[in-house]
Curated annotation (Swiss-Prot):
One Pfam family cited in the UniProt record for this chain: Ribosomal_S25
Top-level taxonomic group: Eukaryota
Gene field: RPS25
Region (Disordered) location: 1-32
Keywords, alphabetical: Ribonucleoprotein, Ribosomal protein
Biased composition (Basic residues): 19-28
UniProt record similarity statement: Belongs to the eukaryotic ribosomal protein eS25 family.
GO annotations of cellular component type: ribonucleoprotein complex; ribosome
InterPro entries registered for this protein in UniProt: Ribosomal_eS25, WH-like_DNA-bd_sf
The name this protein goes by in its record: Small ribosomal subunit protein eS25
Length: 120
């Protein structure tokens, strides 16, 4: 079999120039988040809400509290430490970055009655 007839240099250049040109990437304008105006100190209303509503949450982290109560994360973390000291919530997991808390579940009256005779 004879070798195929090759393209000339000129034909190769034309083929390279006309085809397979990539379009330049258009950078989309990123959607910027609005700057948060979270409070950096507890006021009476927010502190009362922290003490009444937060112990009812199933999963409690500083970032969740910050989002829901519109306070700074550092203030939320300090508030959660205080609630933990007062035994209103329980620490589940602790790392250098964040702490995870949960509510304290009260034992049902039937379970408490059954546990009392066993202790005697």
């Amino acid at each position: 079999m004879p070798p195929k007839a090759g393209q000339t240099k000129k034909a190769k250049m034309e083929a390279a120039n006309k085809g397979a040109k990539k379009t330049t990437k258009k950078w989309s304008k990123g959607q910027s988040r609005e700057a948060l105006q979270n409070a950096v100190m507890f006021d009476k209303e927010t502190y009362d809400k922290l003490r009444s509503e937060v112990p009812k949450y199933k999963l409690i982290t500083p970032s969740i509290i910050s989002d829901r109560l519109k306070i700074a994360v550092s203030i939320a973390a300090a508030g959660l430490k205080q609630l933990c000291r007062e035994k209103l919530i329980r620490l589940v997991s602790c790392s250098s970055k964040t702490r995870v808390y949960t509510r304290i579940v009260q034992a049902a009256p039937a379970e408490a009655a059954a546990a009392a005779p066993a202790a005697e």
